[in-house]
């Protein structure tokens, strides 16, 4: 939606949307010290509202067109090394890597406008590292994480740029049994 040269976002509820897709997942664990896994997702979400809302005769320009602002191909992978009973029985050190890939997709309806000048959420590939030390069989946990360690340009679904490389720390105490 444009108003005086400025772009605004808006929400629209669609009554008939069909989603088809698949998810492939794989996880391999070796001897409690290494695991690797990943997923690949392909989702096709289309507008099946044949007529414009509130009318009975005007056909929708978006009938059977892929819904805007939704990624339809994305994947992630992860790998973790675990050192069980490190220093003390019941403690575990875990070093992990994970990444996320997402193809580029249109911010607005793909059937409207010139393909060369469309607003697109760009393809993204992020990489993260983590280090976690769990003590007393999971009662205490200290974690450090570096998200987007390659400092890639990443965007959310509204094509707003996310923060670059970021570092996080966490200390957790489990008060249950």
Each model region followed by its residue ranges:
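C-terminal regions of RecA-like/P-loop NTPase motor modules
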Residues: 1-3
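Conserved C-terminal beta-signal and adjacent last beta-strands/turns
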Residues: 64-177
């Amino acid at each position: 939606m444009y108003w005086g040269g400025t772009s605004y976002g808006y929400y629209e509820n669609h009554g008939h949307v069909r989603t088809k897709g698949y998810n492939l997942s794989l996880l391999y664990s070796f001897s409690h010290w290494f695991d690797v896994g990943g997923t690949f997702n392909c989702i096709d979400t289309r507008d099946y509202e044949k007529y414009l809302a509130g009318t009975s005769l005007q056909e929708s320009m978006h009938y059977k067109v892929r819904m805007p602002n939704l990624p339809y191909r994305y994947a992630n992978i992860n790998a973790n090394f675990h050192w069980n009973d490190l220093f003390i029985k019941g403690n575990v050190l875990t070093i992990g890597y994970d990444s996320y890939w997402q193809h580029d997709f249109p911010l607005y309806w793909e059937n409207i406008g010139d393909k060369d000048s469309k607003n697109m959420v760009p393809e993204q590939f992020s990489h993260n590292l983590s280090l976690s030390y769990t003590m007393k069989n999971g009662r205490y946990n200290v974690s450090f994480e570096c998200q987007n360690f390659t400092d890639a340009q990443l965007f959310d679904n509204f094509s707003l740029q996310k923060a670059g490389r970021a570092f996080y720390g966490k200390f957790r105490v489990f008060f249950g049994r």
